[in-house]
Amino acid sequence: MADSSSDKEKKENNKQPVYRGVRMRSWGKWVSEIREPRKKSRIWLGTFPTAEMAMRAHDVAAMSIKGTSAILNFPELSKLLPRPVSLSPRDVRAAATKAALMDFDTTAFRSDTETSETTTSNKMSESSESNETVSFSSSSWSSVTSIEESTVSDDLDEIVKLPSLGTSLNESNEFVIFDSLEDLVYMPRWLSGTEEEVFTYNNNDSSLNYSSVFESWKHFP
């Protein structure tokens, strides 16, 4: 039993990887062919020195004949591979040969594709985080500005209290400042008049002439 299990393991280890539409000849070459739809006949695609070349030839033929339902060896190369002019075996074979001769490092191509996808995903994530940060900063700044304006307004209301203005001087209890004495004290005409003006005071039919009084004031220094 132990010998049989070890033989199976050896056979599994010696098995060649399975490629779609590709076979390895005994002398080390790789051949590729594809069955035509709804027919028993096959389209011979050619003999190639490497498995990758034969696989690309098969992928071109499969996409041409089966369309989007084709199962490919290198789906990542589907947009880069050529297409036949028609579905005739000759044109399909020509396109397959052209694809096989194209210089593709499949391993490197897959690595570059994965790296590009990872980089794009990271950039999108960073851009999203950056937009969220900018949005948060803008909202925070707006909130802080609003709070500061409200605080300043409250402080001004507490500090500056303007006196109330009444409709007249009698209704107001505030102080009133006059720019000159003339605004405060009423000056009689006889005090503000010239020396030619005479003020006469009548009391019980008696009259007083104050012209001499004004005349005497002229002698004072």
From Swiss-Prot:
Pfam families registered for this protein in UniProt: AP2
Keyword set for this entry?
Answer: Activator, DNA-binding, Ethylene signaling pathway, Nucleus, Transcription, Transcription regulation
Q: Name one GO biological process term.
A: ethylene-activated signaling pathway
Kindly list the GO molecular function terms attached to this UniProt entry.
Answer: DNA-binding transcription factor activity; transcription cis-regulatory region binding
> Where located?
Nucleus
Residue spans of biased composition, Low complexity class:
116-134
Q: What role does it play? A: Probably acts as a transcriptional activator. Binds to the GCC-box pathogenesis-related promoter element. May be involved in the regulation of gene expression by stress factors and by components of stress signal transduction pathways.
Protein name, as recorded? Ethylene-responsive transcription factor ERF043
Gene of this entry: ERF043
